[in-house]
């Protein structure tokens, strides 16, 4: 009977034979076999002397296999292993117990060097294993693993080198040198024979594994098989299976110690089963008293207590001592207390770059992702997969976030994304949709959401970091999520009506040729019958050749092919459609380009080049995207670059996001409602600083993997931090970076990162920088909630500002404080009726910090300075205006930055708001970077020569140019931020003038004239100049310079802005708002 006819029976029989033979060989007693063997030529080194060691990529950590698999890559190809017996330690005894000789063997493999200690009995056991393997390999057992081994050793010499047979007790001290040489030769010959070198018994004898020789994991550390106890994790809510010791189990694991972490692997599968980071709480204790285990070792850090068990007390002492010695030698920086209580050290001479607004930031993130070779880490409060990172869109979907991630995943890059799992009743960011969308792109993309609110009992706090990390070598840190509404540039446009719009100065419908009239009628009929949202066509016209013009400058139009432009960059997926652009009011703003093109295609011969821009299109601060135009019998159609597609066009105070699973469908009418511009700050760091950012991400990822059962599968791997020793090897560098001293800061706690003690290093750094500033501080922040009363508000930032100003006053010193915050909080609500309860609650605490109450900054200053406080501090917001469909409109610019600059030499950039949620550490998780300049440039401070830092000064100047409107006017002197001329005649004067003009033209809210709700109703009913007399209003608006406006201190000052009793906001704990 053939195998073909009876496959099941014969397969079962063969498997039984294989199992029996395996058992026979496993139990084979090789002690009677001769140790002396025939000498053969063992030199199997590569014949080509040019062969160099092969670099094992870092990505190999994701492809580990079971230790007994025959085809695993452990060694550097073409690189020999050299063995040298350095010394022999003899342990004598007065009893009848034989003396023990312990051999110290030094091994070298490429750049790696390590030592192992072995007794002669270990050599004997190792030799017997190899003899057993030699006999076993001759038997044709039909298993995949065995067949592979037989095929690969068929042509290799199988004769083994000899091992000395004489007993150790017979060796005299003067014979040690000879014995050392014999053992050294034995190992050298074994290691030259691939058949034995690749066998798992050899790798275990040498204390090596698949992770031993990966360059980016740093020096070869301590390794070996050991027993570990389950449990010990510091996970909120876990008892017997967490920290408690009521129930546990022992498992055999392969322990690996590296310079900044240790891990253990499962020998059968090769899977990394846990990673323990070295930190300031890292301690090792040995003994039953400390471990409650005979021959136990206890290893503590901020996240876990790990219990190991050895074969003897001497073995446990050796393990404990070896680990401690290695960590002290290679990981000492991680054991120290660092400045501000941070988990990260100060990294000197690191490369750093700043970003003002998201345009440059998104572009550099996209370019860095494109350069990724191994890993991309992303964590955001909110992530929108369909956003475009480079705009205007001129290359189809190439620079759309989900397309970039899919492309890199297909190239083998591992992508790990952590999202904040929101309380769905409170927030509509739909992280579940984001996760589902990204996970189905490619298996190399893994997404986690945290926290689980029920199991963790975390309902009030959020993961608020915004990080992108490339190959653990470049990291982007700041306040910008990869999400809708964030992209903006220095123009802060209010309008984005899209591809084509009708200018009514063209011919009337009555003057159309009959063919064109028929075409327009057919368009009208087709639009009634075909729903436009189902048309798979990109509806933005992407102008490749044009560039953005300055605000208020005339724009020239040139001829272009509408049909060609509409179809040049089609999207690859049916879902990937942009929101529909309007052609004219005649089509009610809802006609699709698809219908327009098919209706007009027969009549393209009617098109002709246009002349200069029509009157009304060159008004200051109007949308100034790149424009093309064409003439038709219908009127003149002007094509404009669209920057914000679908949900990206937003005004969240007017209306919050809805239907995020329809990314390219508009949710507000862009023809009647201006968008809300977004002002933000971010940074990029390299090398060791980027390693520190990655370390935080890895800590959070591994903690979430342990905490949530759905992530415990092998498809969600543990992440490993790269070594600081290789951090200088930058494969990619962000253009425009400068050298500076960089330190990472964070807010983290048990719920967010699984650590024993909370960290509030961002708060400590803010207070320290403010207290030690000498000339000025410049703050941009989304919130301004401080001035501790130790009852409701606890962070000390506002108090530090007030005390620093008072100190300057007492010392008769010039000192300036610039604060730029949003004019309104970013919550949905109609400010004309007082705003929503959430909006009012934030307004209450902002005003409480700035100017209302004795604990406020101005309250503290007025008590000693009277009205002189105005010479020290300025509070401002940002506002802009434009023309939308023939009407003048205005909107505040939403300041989302989290920035502090001091003295043109120190900068803090991050995700942390100035409020208790971000600063106290126990609440929201945050990330920030403090940059202190080492490179200086000549400057001026208080009228005197001053050496300013390149990083800080450059960032401060760019912020000033943007908000003051000096980007295109270098003649204005903004070098000296302390002088009276700049502070009073430029900064304060510009803010006051702009605010006055906006109030005059638009009667803006918030407004100092409105002290209560009765005045608010009267205020909004009064006529608005922008509507009553647009021409005069335009003349007034020409006097506007930049975006800076004074912050209105007295808006609704006679009202209680805290949530009223009975509202759902009043039920929420006060900590949510602070």
Curated annotation (Swiss-Prot):
Q: Name one GO molecular function term.
A: phosphatidylinositol binding
Which ranges carry the PLD phosphodiesterase domain? 459-486, 891-918
Q: Name positions with the PTM Phosphoserine.
A: 499, 561, 629
Q: Where in the cell is it found?
A: Cytoplasm, Perinuclear region; Endoplasmic reticulum membrane; Golgi apparatus membrane; Late endosome membrane
Domain of life, per the record?
Answer: Eukaryota
The protein's matches in CDD domains, at most eight in alphabetical order, are given as: PH_PLD, PLDc_vPLD1_1, PLDc_vPLD1_2, PX_PLD1
Tell me a GO cellular component: cytoplasmic vesicle
Q: Mind telling me which PROSITE patterns this protein's record contains?
A: PLD, PX
Q: What InterPro entries would the database entry show?
A: PH-like_dom_sf, PH_domain, PLD-like_dom, PLipase_D/transphosphatidylase, PLipase_D_euk, PLipase_D_fam, PX_dom, PX_dom_sf
Covalently attached lipid (S-palmitoyl cysteine), positions: 240-241
Q: How is its activity regulated?
A: Stimulated by phosphatidylinositol 4,5-bisphosphate and phosphatidylinositol 3,4,5-trisphosphate, activated by the phosphokinase C-alpha, by the ADP-ribosylation factor-1 (ARF-1), and to a lesser extent by GTP-binding proteins: RHO A, RAC-1 and CDC42. Inhibited by oleate.
Into which EC class is this enzyme placed? hydrolase
Q: Where is the PX domain?
A: 81-212
Catalytic activity annotation: a 1,2-diacyl-sn-glycero-3-phosphocholine + H2O = a 1,2-diacyl-sn-glycero-3-phosphate + choline + H(+); ethanol + a 1,2-diacyl-sn-glycero-3-phosphocholine = 1,2-diacyl-sn-glycero-3-phosphoethanol + choline; 1,2-dihexadecanoyl-sn-glycero-3-phosphocholine + H2O = 1,2-dihexadecanoyl-sn-glycero-3-phosphate + choline + H(+)
Chain intervals for the UniProt region annotation (Catalytic): 463-928
Gene Ontology terms describing biological process: cellular response to nutrient; chemotaxis; phosphatidic acid biosynthetic process; phospholipid catabolic process; positive regulation of translation; Ras protein signal transduction; regulation of microvillus assembly; regulation of synaptic vesicle cycle
Q: Does the keyword Iron-sulfur apply?
A: no
Similarity comment: Belongs to the phospholipase D family.
Function statement: Function as phospholipase selective for phosphatidylcholine. Implicated as a critical step in numerous cellular pathways, including signal transduction, membrane trafficking, and the regulation of mitosis. May be involved in the regulation of perinuclear intravesicular membrane traffic.
Q: Which disease is it linked to?
A: Cardiac valvular dysplasia 1: An autosomal recessive form of congenital heart defects, characterized by valvular malformations involving the pulmonic, tricuspid and mitral valves.
- Protein name per Swiss-Prot or TrEMBL: Phospholipase D1
Give the species: Homo sapiens (Human)
Top-level taxonomy: Eukaryota, Metazoa, Chordata, Craniata, Vertebrata
């Amino acid at each position: 009977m053939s195998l073909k006819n009876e496959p099941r029976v014969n397969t079962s029989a063969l498997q039984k034979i294989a199992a029996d033979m395996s058992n026979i060989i496993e139990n084979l007693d090789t002690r009677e076999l001769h140790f002396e063997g025939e000498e053969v030529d063992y030199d199997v080194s590569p014949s080509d002397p040019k062969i160099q060691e092969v670099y094992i990529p870092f990505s190999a950590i994701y492809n580990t296999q079971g230790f007994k698999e025959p085809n695993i890559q452990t060694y550097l190809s073409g690189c020999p292993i050299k063995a040298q017996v350095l010394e022999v330690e003899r342990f004598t005894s007065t009893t009848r117990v034989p003396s023990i000789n312990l051999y110290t063997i030094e091994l070298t493999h490429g750049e790696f060097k390590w030592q192992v200690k072995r007794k002669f009995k270990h050599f004997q056991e190792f030799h017997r294993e190899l003899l057993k393997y030699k006999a076993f390999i001759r038997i044709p057992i039909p298993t995949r693993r065995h067949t592979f081994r037989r095929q690969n050793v068929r042509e290799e010499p199988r004769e083994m080198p000899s091992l000395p047979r004489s007993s150790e007790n017979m060796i005299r001290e003067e014979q040690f040198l000879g014995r050392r040489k014999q053992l050294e030769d034995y190992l050298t010959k074994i290691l030259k024979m691939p058949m034995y070198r690749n066998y798992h018994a050899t790798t275990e004898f040498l204390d090596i594994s698949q992770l031993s020789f990966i360059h980016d994991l740093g020096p070869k550390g301590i390794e070996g098989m050991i027993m570990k106890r389950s449990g010990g994790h510091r996970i909120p809510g876990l008892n017997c299976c967490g920290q408690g010791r009521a129930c546990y189990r022992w498992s055999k694991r392969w322990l690996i110690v590296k310079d900044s972490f240790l891990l253990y692997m499962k020998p059968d599968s090769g899977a990394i089963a846990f990673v323990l980071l070295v930190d300031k709480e890292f301690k090792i204790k040995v003994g039953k008293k400390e471990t409650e285990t005979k021959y136990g070792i206890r290893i503590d850090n901020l996240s876990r207590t790990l219990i190991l068990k050895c074969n003897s007390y001497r073995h446990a002492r050796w393990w404990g001592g070896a680990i401690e010695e290695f960590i002290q030698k290679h990981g000492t920086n991680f054991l120290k207390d660092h400045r501000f209580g941070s988990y990260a050290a100060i990294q000197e001479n690191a490369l750093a770059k700043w970003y003002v607004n998201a345009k440059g930031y998104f572009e550099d993130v996209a370019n860095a992702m494109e350069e990724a070779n191994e890993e991309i880490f992303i964590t955001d409060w909110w992530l929108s997969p369909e956003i475009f990172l480079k705009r205007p869109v001129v290359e189809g979907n190439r620079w759309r976030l989900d397309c970039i991630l899919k492309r890199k995943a297909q190239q083998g890059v591992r992508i790990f994304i952590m999202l904040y799992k929101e309380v769905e009743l409170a927030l509509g960011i739909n992280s579940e949709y984001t996760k589902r969308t990204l996970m189905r792109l490619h298996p190399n993309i893994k997404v986690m959401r945290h926290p689980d609110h029920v199991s963790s009992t975390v309902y009030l706090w959020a993961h608020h970091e915004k990080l992108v990390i490339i190959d653990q070598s470049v990291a982007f840190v700041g306040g910008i999520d990869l999400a809708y509404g964030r992209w903006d540039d220095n123009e802060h446009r209010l309008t984005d009506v899209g591809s084509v719009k009708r200018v009514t100065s063209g011919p009337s419908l009555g003057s159309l040729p009959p063919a064109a009239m028929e075409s327009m009628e057919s368009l009208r009929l087709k639009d009634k019958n075909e729903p436009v949202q189902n048309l798979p066509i990109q509806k933005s016209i992407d102008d490749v050749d044009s560039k953005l013009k300055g605000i208020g400058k005339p724009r020239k139009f040139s001829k272009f092919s509408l049909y060609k432009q509409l179809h040049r960059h089609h999207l690859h997926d049916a879902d990937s459609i942009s929101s529909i652009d309007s052609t004219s009011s005649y089509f009610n703003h809802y006609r699709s380009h698809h219908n327009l093109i098919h209706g007009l295609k027969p009549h393209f011969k009617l098109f002709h080049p246009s002349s200069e821009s029509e009157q009304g299109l060159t008004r200051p601060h109007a949308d100034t995207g790149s424009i093309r135009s064409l003439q038709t019998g219908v009127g003149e159609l002007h094509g404009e670059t669209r920057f914000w597609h679908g949900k990206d066009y937003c005004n969240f105070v007017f209306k919050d996001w809805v239907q995020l699973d329809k990314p390219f469908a508009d949710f507000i009418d862009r023809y009647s409602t201006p968008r809300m511009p977004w002002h933000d700050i971010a940074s990029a760091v390299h090398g060791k600083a980027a390693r520190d950012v990655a370390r935080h991400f890895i800590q959070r990822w591994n903690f979430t993997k342990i905490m949530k059962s759905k992530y415990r599968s092998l498809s969600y791997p543990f992440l490993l931090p790269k070594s600081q020793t290789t951090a200088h090897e930058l494969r990619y560098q962000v253009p425009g970076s400068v050298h500076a001293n960089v330190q990472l800061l964070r807010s983290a706690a048990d719920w967010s990162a699984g650590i024993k003690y909370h960290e509030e290093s961002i708060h400590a750094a803010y207070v320290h920088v403010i207290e030690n500033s000498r000339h000025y501080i410049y703050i941009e922040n989304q919130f301004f909630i401080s001035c501790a009363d130790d009852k409701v508000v606890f962070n000390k930032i506002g108090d530090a500002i007030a005390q620093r100003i008072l100190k300057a006053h007492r010392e008769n010193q010039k000192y300036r404080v610039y604060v730029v915050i949003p004019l309104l909080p970013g919550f949905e609500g109609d400010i004309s009726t007082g705003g929503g309860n959430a909006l009012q609650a934030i307004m209450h605490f902002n005003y409480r910090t700035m100017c209302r109450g004795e604990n406020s900054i101005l309250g503290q200053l007025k008590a000693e300075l009277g009205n002189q406080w105005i010479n020290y501090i300025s509070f401002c917001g940002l506002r802009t205006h434009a023309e939308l469909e023939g009407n003048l409109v205005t909107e505040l610019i939403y300041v989302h930055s989290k920035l502090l600059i001091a003295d043109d030499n120190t900068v803090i950039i991050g995700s942390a708001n100035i409020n208790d949620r971000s600063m106290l550490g126990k609440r929201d998780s945050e990330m920030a970077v403090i940059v202190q300049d080492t490179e200086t440039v000549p400057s001026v401070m208080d009228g005197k020569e001053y050496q300013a830092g390149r990083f800080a000064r450059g960032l401060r100047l760019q912020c000033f140019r943007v908000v003051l409107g000096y980007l295109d006017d270098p003649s204005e002197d903004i070098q000296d931020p302390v002088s009276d001329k700049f502070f009073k005649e430029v900064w304060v004067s510009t803010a006051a003038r702009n605010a006055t003009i906006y109030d005059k033209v638009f009667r803006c809210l918030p407004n100092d004239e409105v002290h209560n709700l009765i005045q608010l109703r009267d205020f909004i009913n009064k006529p608005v100049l922008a509507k009553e007399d647009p021409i005069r209003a335009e003349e007034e608006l020409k006097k506007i310079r930049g975006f800076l406006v004074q912050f209105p201190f007295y808006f609704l000052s006679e009202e209680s802005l805290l949530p009223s009793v009975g509202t759902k906001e009043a039920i929420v704990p006060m900590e949510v708002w602070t």
